[in-house]
């Protein structure tokens, strides 16, 4: 599978199937699906760039980025949206699993809980504060410590969710959490 890894600015993008990507995070780590607009800011946002470089898997969520890779580097990759990844994950992997959904608002949290309930997935939710620079969220870390979840989905804004995933992964490395950042 390593032949399906494309490095861009030391970020490991995987041009693989859903199953192969899922296997990469099976033993813990975090998946990111950066937008082209966010990738354009990696030189000015070091914290964001560091979180992408340290991700377990980055997927080609941006069709524009895929086109640019082909035009400028001659590298042909297949777009794999974060939405599609999350949809497949929910429909195939999350039955009888527990999930923590980190949401930007009460409304989003309510809608996600309702959706997970319909899919018969045990879910917990956390409404994230508005993070500025410090992503070390003690309240969130206490919740993660209390509940034993299989997956964490982070549904806050891009350039923030990836940094939060990095902090969670660093704090709970031994728990082997599977963290999914697919967009707000």
Over which residues does each language-model region extend?
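Short, conserved loop/helix-junction motifs that constitute active-site signature segments
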Residues: 50-53, 94, 170-175
